[in-house]
Amino acid sequence: MLTHLDSQGRANMVDVTEKAVTEREATAEARVRMLPQTLQMIVDGEHPKGDVFAVARIAGIQAAKKTSDLIPLCHPLMLTSVKVELSAEGQDTVRIVARCKLAGQTGVEMEALTAASVAALTIYDMCKAVDKGMVIEQVRLLEKLGGKSGHYKVQA
């Protein structure tokens, strides 16, 4: 059953009033594939717009906090932790890992996915002048802890 639909099939924000407050955590990732020279410029700190990883990290954190403004049926959440980690993978990829936590009545998967996605979009925005062919890919949930549905971890 899709929880965001009422009995008539209309969009509906889920009522979490009666749900217990529990610790919840979610981890998501995204990757940005680019030209090797673009990644080298980022890693060497030679991008004319500044520290690409620092700006993308802040954008991801801010995005997690704004998820309910972007995705209509998401609840506004009081996040207790948002961490966004960026790293070079190989010669042409940036990997972004976003982790969100809270003690609340609903999960934080969308916040983690939004953080990873917006960090990736920020990298694209900052680097598009030198590499328009970048590809944002593999945006996915890696792990979820807490809540009624329990623990989920992506299969390797």
Curated annotation (Swiss-Prot):
One GO MF term, please? cyclic pyranopterin monophosphate synthase activity
Give, as one word, the top-level EC class.
lyase
Q: Which residues bind substrate?
A: L73, C74, H75, M110, E111
Q: Which reaction does it catalyse?
A: (8S)-3',8-cyclo-7,8-dihydroguanosine 5'-triphosphate = cyclic pyranopterin phosphate + diphosphate
The reply to whether ATP-binding figures as a keyword in the UniProt entry is: no
- What does the record give as EC number? 4.6.1.17
Cite the annotated pathway. Cofactor biosynthesis; molybdopterin biosynthesis
Q: Which GO terms describe its biological process?
A: Mo-molybdopterin cofactor biosynthetic process
Q: Which Pfam families match?
A: MoaC
Q: Which UniProt keywords apply?
A: Lyase, Molybdenum cofactor biosynthesis
Catalytic residues (positions):
D125
- This protein's superkingdom? Bacteria
| General function of this protein | Catalyzes the conversion of (8S)-3',8-cyclo-7,8-dihydroguanosine 5'-triphosphate to cyclic pyranopterin monophosphate (cPMP).
Query: Could you describe the subunit structure of this protein?
Result: Homohexamer; trimer of dimers.
Which family is it part of?
Answer: Belongs to the MoaC family.
What the entry lists under PANTHER family is as follows: CYCLIC PYRANOPTERIN MONOPHOSPHATE SYNTHASE, MOLYBDOPTERIN COFACTOR SYNTHESIS PROTEIN A
Q: What is the protein name given in its UniProt record?
A: Cyclic pyranopterin monophosphate synthase
